[in-house]
């Protein structure tokens, strides 16, 4: 599926700010895919990526994981091993409101990644967090089951499939 977020904004202009929302530009681009899209699965965690491994262990075909890591810049929520697992299980991409690590390796993996930045330190492993709850960051609420579109120009969230 090919798309451009500017074209989607133009095509669905009357729905902008309603069913189609533009995420505040704040993310760095990583991973081997410059663009990705899919149905949203969410995690709300803080400096503990135990649930990320669990979710990436599931079938991710046609899905994007949105991680609300509280915007923490103190550790990385996704590293190369989790990106490899996500790719193996068919995930389209991941948006991390937090940091990743092993960015050089992740850039060679066929998965789309957006994150605030990088950090070399791993997280705690306590198994704490929530799955498939509405999360809000970047001026947008991400609801499980909605759709996310990301490319070089930005990230969009929509209540319905746009392509």
Swiss-Prot record:
Catalytic activity: 4-hydroxy-4-methyl-2-oxoglutarate = 2 pyruvate; oxaloacetate + H(+) = pyruvate + CO2
Family assignment from sequence similarity: Belongs to the class II aldolase/RraA-like family.
Function of the molecule: Catalyzes the aldol cleavage of 4-hydroxy-4-methyl-2-oxoglutarate (HMG) into 2 molecules of pyruvate. Also contains a secondary oxaloacetate (OAA) decarboxylase activity due to the common pyruvate enolate transition state formed following C-C bond cleavage in the retro-aldol and decarboxylation reactions.
Enzyme class: lyase
Residues bound to a divalent metal cation: 102
CDD domains: RraA_family (cd16841)
Listed EC numbers: 4.1.3.17, 4.1.1.112
Domain of life: Bacteria
Biological classification of the source: Bacteria, Pseudomonadati, Pseudomonadota, Betaproteobacteria, Rhodocyclales
Residues annotated for substrate binding in this entry: 79-82, 101
Gene Ontology MF terms: 4-hydroxy-4-methyl-2-oxoglutarate aldolase activity; metal ion binding; oxaloacetate decarboxylase activity; ribonuclease inhibitor activity
Quaternary assembly: Homotrimer.
Sorted UniProt keywords: Lyase, Metal-binding
GO biological process, one term: regulation of RNA metabolic process
Chain ranges passing through the membrane: none
Cofactor: a divalent metal cation
Name recorded for this polypeptide: Putative 4-hydroxy-4-methyl-2-oxoglutarate aldolase
Bound cofactor: record note: Divalent metal cation.
PANTHER family: 4-HYDROXY-4-METHYL-2-OXOGLUTARATE ALDOLASE 3-RELATED
């Amino acid at each position: 599926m090919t798309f451009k977020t500017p074209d989607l904004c133009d095509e669905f202009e009357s729905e902008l700010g309603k069913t189609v929302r533009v995420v505040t530009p704040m993310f760095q681009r990583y991973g081997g895919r410059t663009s990705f899209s899919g149905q949203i699965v969410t995690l709300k965690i803080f400096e503990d990526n135990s649930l990320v491994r669990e979710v990436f262990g599931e079938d991710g075909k046609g899905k994007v994981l949105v991680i609300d890591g509280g915007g923490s810049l103190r550790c990385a929520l996704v590293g190369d091993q989790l990106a490899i697992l996500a790719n193996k299980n068919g995930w389209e991409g991941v948006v991390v409101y937090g940091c990743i690590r092993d960015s050089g390796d992740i850039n060679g993996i066929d998965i789309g990644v957006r994150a605030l930045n990088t950090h070399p330190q791993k997280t705690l492993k306590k198994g704490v967090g929530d799955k498939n709850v509405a999360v809000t960051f970047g001026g947008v609420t991400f609801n499980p089951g909605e759709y996310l579109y990301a490319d070089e120009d930005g990230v969009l969230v929509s209540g319905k499939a746009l392509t």
